[in-house]
Structure formats: structure tokens, C-alpha cells
């Protein structure tokens, strides 16, 4: 049996070649590693909650909470939690989740968002200008990408079979357990085209929102 799945993303990423996306993913991961190490040392010697005041800005809602969440997710990733492993193309069988994912994909999906959140926090804390060399170039690139006007889109993937999928934690998917999950990883590379992506606002308009959970409507 074949199924329809969705991928929420940003057209900025779709306009990049696969090689460019691979390079930028490495850039983002390098920035995440740098700041995770920086703030990990900070947490060993100081109370991370002392940063709350500097990371509170009415123009950037939940800045401190997002920063803290990024630290926790990176902690779990470093500890081997496969739920937070990134790199594969993630898809969902729920249209409302694709809409939600696309609206936070402006910084290059979850990979870029983690790097972007660290860079924004570093700027607010006044430590960004301490960077130099390659890491400064990488952080600048991450910030510019995240600040570029967002273009949320949803891609529809047809004829997907369970054998093409893994669960979020990397387990095999079968026709018997496929309906027990909402988000999946594609095993193979799947080239998405910006010409077949639909602007999120239009995709959402075409969905039956009466079937959406209230918090997504």
C-alpha cells in the first residue's frame, strides 16, 4: 500500500543544491558544537539561569526558553538520543504538522534553527564579537540565512511505501505500525523541487481544518 506524506520546509532551502545543503548542514553543526561546548563550560561554573535577564527581549518572544531548549536537545543528541538525530529528510502523514514545521523552518530546518538560536543568544549576551576565523564566518552565514525573509512551503510526497521509511528513532516501519506514528525519516535521498512546493498559506487553506487539533487551527 502506498501513502501520501508531507514535508514542511522553507523555499530558501529548496533553492539550494544538494551539495549546498550538505555544506550548510555541516556549517550549522559546527556552530552548534562550538556554542554547546562554550555554554557547557559556562554551566559547570555558573548558574545558566543567570542569563535569563539578558536573554529576555519583548521583540524576541521566548528567547531564553528557546536557548535553554536548544541546550537540552544538544545534550540529548550528544548522549546518543536518536530522537534528535538530524540529516535525513523528515516527513509526516499529518498535514497540520507539515504546516507547523514549515513555519519554523526559516533558519534551515531544525538543524539551522539550533545554530541560529545559539547565534542570537550570543549576540544578546555580547559574546558574538569574540569570534574570529572560520567559526565567525560560519556564524555570520547562519545568522544571515535566518534573518533572510522566510518563505514557508509544504511539499507533498506521493506513493510512499512503509519500506521507504524509518520512525523518528530509526526503527523499521511496516504497514501494521505505520498509523501508530506521525513523523518519519526517509531512508533514501528524495530530491524536492521548489516548483512543486506549495506556499504554506495556500496549502493550509486547502486543508480540512475541522480535522485539525484545536491548537493547530
Predicted regions, residues:
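ADP-ribose/NAD+-binding catalytic cleft of ART/PARP-like enzymes
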Residues: 1-84
